[in-house]
């Protein structure tokens, strides 16, 4: 399977899913959420463990707010229900252990993505930030 926003490697029964939009600190867009969901679901069948990490200096900066067209047309309820919930549930319900290798900041939805795994291992440069907790988005 070919992915545009992530990479998936499988070696020695270890699936490594790498968020691969480093130019936007691996910000989540609709395509990336769908690809993560699909890759985790498939890896749960093919691997004995799934590792999530990010390319570049960040794990994930959260929702891609730089794509003005997508943000202008964003239906938050639909996006949470139809995109974020399936992505997070794929990780939470994965039949094999899931590990987040936190290589830098994980903010907002990126922090939630990181914390959905069974185990989170962070580099010294990593941190989690809940950017929208004051409006109930955690």
Segments from the language model and where they lie:
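Conserved CoA-thioester-binding segment of acyl-CoA-metabolizing enzymes
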Residues: 1-55, 89
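Hydrophobic/aromatic residues within transmembrane alpha-helices
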Residues: 17, 52, 64, 113-115
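Hydrophobic alpha-helical membrane-association signature
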Residues: 32-36, 83, 113
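Glycine- (often His-adjacent) and acidic-residue-rich active-site loop
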Residues: 46, 54-90, 106, 134
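CoA-thioester-processing core
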Residues: 87, 91-93, 101, 107-138
């Amino acid at each position: 399977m070919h992915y545009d926003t992530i990479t998936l490697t499988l070696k020695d029964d270890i699936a490594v899913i790498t968020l691969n939009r480093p130019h936007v600190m691996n910000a989540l867009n609709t395509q990336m959420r769908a690809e993560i969901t699909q890759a985790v679901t498939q890896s749960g069948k093919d691997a004995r463990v799934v590792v999530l990490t990010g390319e570049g200096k960040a794990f994930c900066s959260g929702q891609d707010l730089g794509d003005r067209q997508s943000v202008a047309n964003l239906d938050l309820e639909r996006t949470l229900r139809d995109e974020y919930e399936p992505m997070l549930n794929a990780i939470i319900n994965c039949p094999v252990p899931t590990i987040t290798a936190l290589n830098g900041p994980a903010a907002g939805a990126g922090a939630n993505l990181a914390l959905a795994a069974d185990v989170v291992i962070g580099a010294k440069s990593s941190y989690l930030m809940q950017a929208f907790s004051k409006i109930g988005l955690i």
